[in-house]
């Protein structure tokens, strides 16, 4: 049986959202796969499902299907593409509870948080359903009276998307919605830890009327082989990837020979700064929202918390008191706010970062250890006495650990915050308006949260600078990377 009782106790076995196959050219198929791979619940270690282990051959077939379907999809009036996307959005909202149950089962985040992700993911489809009708060109004043100069924008073509496990719904729709809206077709490779959510989204896309070949899903564990095919196949004209900076570099190199368009949303290591004129209670709430959402497994979560010296102890005490009250456990249990780490590798990294900090002089205010028993759980943690030489200062922890650094001056903390190869997101809490402007302009990051710990929205451009990536997702700018600009010069008029 492809699906086990560990999954069907949360999602009915008869649910149309459960498919044990990839989706190529409008057909649910195992392709030529001779092996399967397992999908596990990280909260319990239980087997949820076994899926076909697809590879380069199936990816090539999906690319061929997308390439054949792309001209017809692009030729459809924007209003038609918009209507289909809107129907997909409606189906996601109508099936939000079932989608959230699938997501919680395979990824582990608490069910209310998973449901929030589903609605957030759907919002990108709704947004780009509207933006599909607003892909405008422009006219240019000609240098002579017998010419007319026009710029039009056309879809780039076939797009390959590679998405991570930490937001298995939102990372997919944030890429696919703008691509489909402007007339591109897509081959999607979800993370092998969380393929069931992607499959469920494809089921609803099919129900919404997205034609065969327009949206394809490849499931499998051989990410390098699938990635090489997507990057090396000349029919694919764009790659969009969310994941580690290390893998992003590899994909960028593989795309270089064909000068393929690339969008990359990579690592973070976000600073979270608390100045002495901040509202400390609000800063604590913002830190919790930013740091502990999804058990700290987000690329934009606060990774380094800098607190000005004269409020350091007060902030640390307030934060530790709140964090100590957090309930950790299976995401399906009521009241749980911190779920598991995605796997043993993720848990081991968190343990290593905490051990390294303690060995170098840091202190634990609360938490600091894994939770014994089934699942990959780590207690929500607050560390004080943290210094630059520790791993928590240089690497993304990707776990529920808040290391508190002490600083004295604005200049000092700006230098520390910018002392990283990354530049995705940063946060700070302050009261003085002049300071707010100066700090926001000085921080070398693509997104800045000011007096808030949450800033992601389908209406805003998401993306980083430095080695945190290229391009933007969301907002009216999010469609740009899926379009080519074409200049038309008409003479003799």
Model-derived regions, located:
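A short hydrophobic/small-residue beta-strand
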Residues: 185-187, 364, 447
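Terminal low-complexity tails and localization/encapsulation signals of metabolic enzymes
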Residues: 1-50, 83, 87, 135-162, ...
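Glycine-rich loop-to-alpha-helix module at the N-terminal edge of alpha/beta enzyme cores
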Residues: 46-135, 146
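Residue-level signal for inorganic ion chemistry
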Residues: 45, 66, 81, 103, ...
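ALDH superfamily catalytic-core signature
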Residues: 246-387, 450, 492
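Conserved C-terminal structural/oligomerization subdomain of aldehyde/semialdehyde dehydrogenase
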Residues: 44-50, 236, 273, 327-331, ...
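Rossmann-like NAD(P) dinucleotide-binding subdomain of oxidoreductase/dehydrogenase enzymes
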Residues: 137-282, 407
């Amino acid at each position: 049986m492809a699906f086990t009782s560990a999954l069907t106790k949360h999602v009915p076995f008869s649910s149309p959202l459960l498919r044990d196959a990839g989706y190529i050219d409008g057909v649910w198929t195992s392709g030529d796969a001779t092996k399967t791979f397992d999908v596990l619940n990280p909260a319990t270690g239980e087997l949820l499902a076994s899926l076909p282990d697809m590879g380069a051959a199936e990816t090539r077939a999906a690319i061929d299907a997308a390439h054949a379907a792309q001209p017809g999809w692009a030729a459809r009036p924007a209003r038609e593409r918009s209507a289909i996307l809107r129907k997909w959005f409606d189906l996601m909202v109508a099936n939000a509870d079932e989608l959230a149950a699938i997501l919680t089962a395979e990824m582990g985040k608490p069910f209310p948080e998973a449901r929030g992700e589903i609605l957030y993911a759907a919002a990108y489809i709704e947004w780009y359903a509207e933006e599909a009708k607003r892909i405008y060109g422009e006219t240019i004043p000609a240098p002579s009276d017998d010419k007319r100069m026009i710029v039009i924008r056309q879809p780039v073509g076939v797009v390959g998307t590679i998405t991570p496990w930490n937001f298995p719904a939102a990372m997919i729709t944030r890429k696919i919605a703008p691509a489909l809206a402007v007339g591109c077709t897509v081959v999607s490779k979800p993370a092998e830890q969380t393929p069931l959510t992607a499959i469920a989204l494809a089921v609803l896309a099919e129900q919404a009327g997205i034609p065969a070949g327009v949206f394809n899903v490849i499931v499998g564990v051989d990410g390098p082989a699938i990635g090489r095919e997507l990057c090396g196949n000349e029919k694919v004209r764009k790659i969009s990837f969310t994941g580690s900076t290390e893998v992003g570099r590899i994909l960028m190199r593989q795309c270089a020979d064909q000068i393929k368009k690339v969008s990359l949303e990579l690592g973070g290591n976000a600073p979270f700064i608390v100045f002495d004129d901040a509202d400390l209670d609000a800063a604590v709430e913002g830190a919790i929202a930013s740091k502990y959402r999804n058990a700290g497994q987000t690329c934009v979560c606060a990774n380094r918390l800098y607190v000005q010296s004269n409020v350091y102890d007060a902030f640390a005490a307030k934060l530790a008191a709140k964090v100590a009250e957090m309930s950790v456990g299976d995401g399906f249990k009521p009241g749980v706010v911190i779920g598991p780490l995605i796997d043993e590798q993720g848990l081991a990294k968190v343990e290593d970062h905490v051990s390294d900090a303690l060995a170098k002089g840091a202190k634990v205010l609360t938490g600091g250890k894994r939770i014994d028993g089934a699942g990959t759980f780590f207690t929500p943690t607050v560390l004080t006495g943290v210094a630059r030489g520790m791993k928590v200062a240089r690497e993304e922890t990707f776990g529920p650990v808040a290391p508190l650094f002490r600083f004295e001056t604005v200049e000092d903390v700006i230098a520390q915050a910018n002392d990283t190869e990354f530049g995705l997101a940063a946060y700070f809490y302050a009261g003085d308006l002049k300071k707010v402007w100066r700090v926001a302009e000085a921080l070398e990051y693509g997104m800045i949260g000011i007096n808030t710990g949450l800033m992601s929205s389908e209406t805003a451009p998401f993306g980083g600078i430095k080695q945190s990536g290229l391009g933007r997702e969301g907002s009216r700018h999010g469609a740009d990377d899926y379009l080519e600009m074409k200049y038309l010069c008409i003479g003799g008029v």
